[in-house]
Amino acid sequence: PHDLSIMTYNIQMLGIGEKDAPAKIVDYINNSGNDIVCMQEFPQREASFKKFPAYPYYHRHRDVAFISRYPIVNKGVINFDKGHSAACVYGDITIGKDTIRVYSIHLESYRLGKNEQQIYKELTSGNTQNATQGVKTISSRLVTANRNRAKQAQIIKNHMQQSPYPVIICGDFNDTPISFAYHTLSEGMKDCFIEKGRGLGNTYIGEFPSFRIDHILHTPTLGT
């Protein structure tokens, strides 16, 4: 078996809107030394892959992609119901005499915008006078997104169970390790952070509380 390094990264359209962010993100990935990089919120332009010359093999659907130093011998897309913002791609990658299947996923987000962020700020600062209706809106979106992610996770899990090769699944789950979606996808798998990580491992940075919502899971036979 070969050593393999893999990374998952929500690149937020290469940091669009921030002057130096695109170049910094590209340099970070190119210099990371990883064999495979799974990305979410990837620009939907074929030319974007040319920014990663060390990774000649790639696959993308919507805003989800992965790039690889090793050949992709088979690749596909998992489709979800119309109207869902989730996306998932997979590919079978040959490394020497071995083949693995890699999934790059981006499960549905809560779709909380600036208005919801402002409501959250008011709530956390103790200003609840104008936030009642906003709380109802946020609660509704949380419930809907959780239900949708649960369905999406089950569809992906069903596909994973048919894989003829060991599996690595990684990406932006938009959900924590105590969620139904994570539980569904991690059943029978190993979590790289649990195996090798330290601390809380928070991966979300934003207006809302930080959690570990990005994950890398793998078939136990692959080791960590």
Where is each model-derived feature located?
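Residue-level marker for buried hydrophobic side chains located in beta-strands
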Residues: 6-7, 38, 169
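Active-site metal-binding loops of divalent metal-dependent hydrolases
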Residues: 11, 42, 107, 172-173
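Metal-dependent phosphoester-hydrolase catalytic domains
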Residues: 151, 155-167, 173-224
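Structured beta-strand-rich core segments of catalytic domains in phosphoester-bond hydrolases
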Residues: 1, 17-21, 30, 36-120, ...
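Alpha-helical transmembrane signal-anchor/signal-peptide segments
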Residues: 2-7, 23-24
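A solvent-exposed, charged loop/short amphipathic helix patch at secondary-structure junctions
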Residues: 117-140
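Stable alpha-helical elements in mature extracytoplasmic
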Residues: 21, 25, 45, 145, ...
